[in-house]
Every structure is written in structure tokens, then in C-alpha cells.
């Protein structure tokens, strides 16, 4: 079967159902019943991680910013889960699609900016013109600050897309090289296979780091506007 570098981005199906959907739904069968939630180790670990991330991100926010805690925690769990699911064999990573990442970044950025203009109108407008700017530079700086404001959601989406896509392509290329070298040089194939294993472990870390970075930047945008 002929394949190219982007074959892995095609959503696989089993019996007409998307494989990722089956993977996501299956763990729900293993969840503990409600009367065991208190003593369940998995739930305790999950709550500890959420509290740790929440403390790191929300400590800089005031009372108005704290109301976004649940949304930001849901965001980091969603992005982290989709990134990790993409590392499973024959699965698809939704965050490799720029359209999806823009669909997340634009509403979150717009919500933060609108909140800022509604609650702190003068302070939000002051960001477009730094204090002490020479009069001849005022029009240029206003244009530059406006462009930098509107480019923020694009930077969020492109950063996530590029990092996740680059890792998947590297895994595909090194995996293909390993298969090709097995019939040529076993020693070289073992070296490339070791590199592949290390790269895969690195991708697990990147998947979580990118989820954290995306959510942290949204949190910082929110902090600037609350």
C-alpha cells in the first residue's frame, strides 16, 4: 500500500466508527462508581494535578480572573488528552489541524479582550499607546500595537499546530528509516530504533507541555484584561 507523510492524519475507522471515539469512550467503562470516588487513587491523583496546575496559573489573577479557573482547567485537560491520543498507533491528532486550534484560540482571546474593554476600558486602550511615546511615533505605535493584539490568537494556534505536527512527522520519518535499514544494516537500524523510542518519549512530554503553554498564554491574556 502506498503511503505518504500525511497518511497518519486520516481518521481511521473500525466498523464505521472513528477509532478515536472508541478510545475515548472505552475508559468510561472502567471508571469507579460514585460510592468509591473518595478512596479512588486515580481520582485523588487527578485532583492533585488539577490543584497544582490551577495554583500555578491562577495565582496571578484577581477575583474576576479566578472565575475562569474551571474553563482553563477544562482547556488544558482537553488539549492534553487530544495530544496524547494522537500518539496511539493508527489514531488522529485533532490539534494538528490549524482550523481546530484557531477555533479554540479566537473565542478565548476574544473573550479575554472583550472582558478587558468592558471592565477596564481606559486601561485596555492605554495598551495601544505606551506612556512617554514621542508625538511623531504615535500613529505608527498604535498600528503596531493593534496588529500585535490581533496576531495573538494566530500565534497561539500556529505554535500548537507546528509543534505537534513536527513531532509526528519526525516519528514517521525515523520509523520509516528504521524499517528500511533493517534489511541493510541491523546495527544502524537498532540505533535509529533507539532514537525513535527516545523521540516518542519526548513527544509524550511535548504533548503535555504544549497543552500547558497554550493554557498559560490564555491565562496571561486574561490577566492583562481583568
UniProtKB/Swiss-Prot annotation:
Q: Does the keyword Transmembrane helix apply?
A: yes
**Transmembrane region(s):** 9-29, 68-88, 97-117, 138-158, 164-184, 189-209
Tell me where on the tree of life, at the top rank, the source sits.
Eukaryota
Q: Which residues carry this modification: N-formylmethionine?
A: 1
Q: Name one GO molecular function term.
A: proton-transporting ATP synthase activity, rotational mechanism
Localization (cell): Mitochondrion inner membrane
Record's SUPFAM superfamilies?
A: F1F0 ATP synthase subunit A
Q: Which InterPro entries does this one have?
A: ATP_synth_F0_asu, ATP_synth_F0_asu_AS, ATP_synth_F0_asu_bact/mt, F0_ATP_A_sf
Q: How does it sit in the membrane?
A: Multi-pass membrane protein
Keyword Membrane in record: yes
Q: Which UniProt keywords apply?
A: ATP synthesis, CF(0), Formylation, Hydrogen ion transport, Ion transport, Membrane, Mitochondrion, Mitochondrion inner membrane, Transmembrane, Transmembrane helix, Transport
- Record-linked CDD domains: ATP-synt_Fo_a_6
What GO cellular component term, any one, is given?
A: proton-transporting ATP synthase complex
Record-level GO BP terms: proton motive force-driven ATP synthesis; proton motive force-driven mitochondrial ATP synthesis; proton transmembrane transport
Catalysed reaction equations from the record: H(+)(in) = H(+)(out)
Q: Which family does it belong to?
A: Belongs to the ATPase A chain family.
Which PANTHER family would you find in this protein's record? Answer: ATP SYNTHASE SUBUNIT A (PTHR11410:SF0)
Please give the subunit comment from the record.
Answer: Component of the ATP synthase complex composed at least of ATP5F1A/subunit alpha, ATP5F1B/subunit beta, ATP5MC1/subunit c (homooctomer), MT-ATP6/subunit a, MT-ATP8/subunit 8, ATP5ME/subunit e, ATP5MF/subunit f, ATP5MG/subunit g, ATP5MK/subunit k, ATP5MJ/subunit j, ATP5F1C/subunit gamma, ATP5F1D/subunit delta, ATP5F1E/subunit epsilon, ATP5PF/subunit F6, ATP5PB/subunit b, ATP5PD/subunit d, ATP5PO/subunit OSCP.
The free-text function statement in the UniProt record for this protein reads: Subunit a, of the mitochondrial membrane ATP synthase complex (F(1)F(0) ATP synthase or Complex V) that produces ATP from ADP in the presence of a proton gradient across the membrane which is generated by electron transport complexes of the respiratory chain. ATP synthase complex consist of a soluble F(1) head domain - the catalytic core - and a membrane F(1) domain - the membrane proton channel. These two domains are linked by a central stalk rotating inside the F(1) region and a stationary peripheral stalk.
Query: In its UniProt entry, what is this protein called?
Result: ATP synthase F(0) complex subunit a
Tell me the organism.
Bos taurus (Bovine)
The gene name on file is: MT-ATP6
Amino acid at each position: 500500500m502506498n503511503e505518504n507523510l500525511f497518511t497518519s492524519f486520516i481518521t481511521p475507522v473500525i466498523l464505521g466508527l472513528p477509532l478515536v471515539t472508541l478510545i475515548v469512550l472505552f475508559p468510561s467503562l472502567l471508571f469507579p462508581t460514585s460510592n468509591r470516588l473518595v478512596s479512588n487513587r486515580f481520582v485523588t491523583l487527578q485532583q492533585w494535578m488539577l490543584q497544582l496546575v490551577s495554583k500555578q496559573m491562577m495565582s496571578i489573577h484577581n477575583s474576576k480572573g479566578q472565575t475562569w479557573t474551571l474553563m482553563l482547567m477544562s482547556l488544558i485537560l482537553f488539549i492534553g488528552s487530544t495530544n496524547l491520543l494522537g500518539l496511539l498507533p493508527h489514531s488522529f491528532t485533532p490539534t494538528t489541524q490549524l482550523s481546530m486550534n484557531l477555533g479554540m484560540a479566537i473565542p478565548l482571546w476574544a473573550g479575554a479582550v472583550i472582558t478587558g474593554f468592558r471592565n477596564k476600558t481606559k486601561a485596555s486602550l492605554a495598551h495601544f499607546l505606551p506612556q512617554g511615546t514621542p508625538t511623531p511615533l504615535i500613529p505608527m505605535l498604535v498600528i503596531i500595537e493593534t496588529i500585535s493584539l490581533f496576531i495573538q490568537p494566530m500565534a497561539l494556534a500556529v505554535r500548537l499546530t507546528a509543534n505537534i505536527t513536527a513531532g509526528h512527522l519526525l516519528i514517521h520519518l525515523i520509523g520509516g528509516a528504521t524499517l528500511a535499514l533493517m534489511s541493510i544494516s541491523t546495527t544502524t537500524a537498532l540505533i535509529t530504533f533507539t532514537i525513535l523510542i527516545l523521540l516518542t518519549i519526548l513527544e509524550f512530554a511535548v504533548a503535555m507541555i504544549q497543552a500547558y503553554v497554550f493554557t498559560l498564554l490564555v491565562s496571561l491574556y486574561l490577566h492583562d484584561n481583568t
